[in-house]
């Protein structure tokens, strides 16, 4: 499920845990990160650098992230 980082941080600060943030630039990396987060039952932050956005294009990255959240709706993703 897509959530805001504000929601994520509020919960993590109350429950005293960290959230991993990972740079993404293609489908395989997004799949691997979200699959690992699902395996660990952990929220995750996906981020893209300006060069990754230029390389992969923001619309493609957004659709790939949406697909990953549909595959793992139980995992909070920002």
Spans of model-derived segments:
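N-terminal amphipathic alpha-helix/helix-capping segment at the start of soluble metabolic enzymes
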Residues: 1-20
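A short linear-motif detector with a strong N-terminal bias
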Residues: 1-2, 24, 58
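Short, well-ordered alpha-helical microsegments
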Residues: 29-31
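Short, compositionally biased "basic patch" segments
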Residues: 1-6, 36-39, 65
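Active-site beta-loop-alpha junctions enriched in small/polar residues
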Residues: 24-27, 49-51
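Conserved, mostly hydrophobic/aromatic
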Residues: 23, 33
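Active-site cofactor/substrate anionic-group-binding motifs, chiefly glycine-
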Residues: 39-78
């Amino acid at each position: 499920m897509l959530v805001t980082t504000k929601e994520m941080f509020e919960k993590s600060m109350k429950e005293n845990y960290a959230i991993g943030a990972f740079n993404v630039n293609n489908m395989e990396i997004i799949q691997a990160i979200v699959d690992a987060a699902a395996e660990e039952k952990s929220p995750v932050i996906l981020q893209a650098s300006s060069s990754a956005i230029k390389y992969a294009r923001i619309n493609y990255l957004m659709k790939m992230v949406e697909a990953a959240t549909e595959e793992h709706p139980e995992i909070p993703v920002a």
